[in-house]
Design a protein with these regions (language model features):
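Short hydrophobic/aromatic segments of transmembrane alpha-helices and their interfaces
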Residues: 19-20, 206
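Bacterial N-terminal signal peptides that target proteins for export
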Residues: 2-19
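C-terminal motif of bacterial Sec signal peptides marking the signal peptidase cleavage site
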Residues: 26-30
Length: 275
């Protein structure tokens, strides 16, 4: 169990997984237990901490910082959005370009409390036919109509990039100048593996036990970035896992869309998500 509030390992990855499901359907047609919010945010420090690992964990967002922006990158996807602890909400978006046909799918999920909406937009589609026609509005989903309800995001804590589980799995942490940290993470730890991707971690073999990372903490004591430099293994190329948090307390607050901005999801939306 981590010392700071976190999202369940893989929260962002499930959002990317839902996007992958939509892409697969489009082309055919044309984590561990939830964390707690019991930790406290960090405070700025100008001198090295006696325990750098605990100092870095204390910088992971815990829900007391207000709404903030995030972005994330793993082996297969890039995501960005907003986390709003007061609304128990997340807004996340991913954009993926189809290498064969050249069009881009931009998919967004909005979660507020127990409700969830989806929005899908295709760009660069000139000359293409067979793409699904969906409303250009937020489509509210009924989770009971999803084959796998866990394939779509839910609000499970503020650390949607799973920085906490990764830092917790660090075997060495050293504090550098300018609030920068560096060390080594053992990705075979269960929660860290779920956060980064269990298949990707398994492919690393013994190298998964010695993955270097760097992290930066802002002047306000809050984590601003965490980067894992994942080495090449077998036929897999080296890649980076990146989490960035920004605009603590100043990001837009989230709320359920109303009026003409939303509608119930049509049958086609469920067909896409259910594959």
């Amino acid at each position: 169990m981590m010392t700071n509030g976190t999202g369940r390992a893989g929260t962002v990855r499930r959002g990317a997984g839902a996007l992958a499901a939509v892409l697969a359907t489009t082309l055919l047609a044309g984590c561990g237990p939830a964390g707690t919010d019991s930790g406290s945010g960090g405070t700025a420090s100008t001198s090295p901490s006696a325990n750098p690992k605990q100092a870095l964990l204390a910088a992971v967002p815990d829900g007391s910082e207000g709404a903030f922006r995030f972005s994330g990158k793993d082996a297969t996807s890039d995501l960005s959005g907003v986390v709003d602890p007061a609304a128990k909400g997340i807004d996340l978006t991913a954009a993926v370009k189809d290498p064969e046909h050249g069009f881009t799918t931009r998919m967004s999920f909005l979660v507020v409390q127990e409700r969830i909406w989806m929005k899908v937009k295709f760009t660069g589609t000139d000359g293409l036919t067979g793409l699904p026609k969906l409303p250009n509005r937020w489509m509210e989903l009924d989770r009971s109509r999803l084959t796998d309800p866990d394939a779509t995001p839910t609000y499970e804590g503020v650390d949607v990039g799973n920085a906490g589980p990764i830092i917790q799995a660090a075997t060495t942490v050293e504090e550098k100048a300018d609030r920068t940290y560096a060390g080594v993470v053992d990705l075979t730890a269960a929660e860290a593996a779920k956060a980064v991707g269990e298949e990707e971690v398994a492919a690393l073999g013994d190298a998964a036990r010695q993955v270097p990372f760097t992290a930066v903490v802002g002047a306000d004591g809050n984590l601003t970035s965490l980067t894992l430099d994942v080495p090449a293994a077998g036929t897999a190329k080296a890649w980076t896992y990146v989490v960035k948090y920004a605009d603590y307390g100043s990001a837009p607050k989230l709320a359920a869309p109303g009026g003409d901005a939303a509608q119930p999801a049509p049958k086609l939306a469920y067909q896409m998500l259910n594959g």
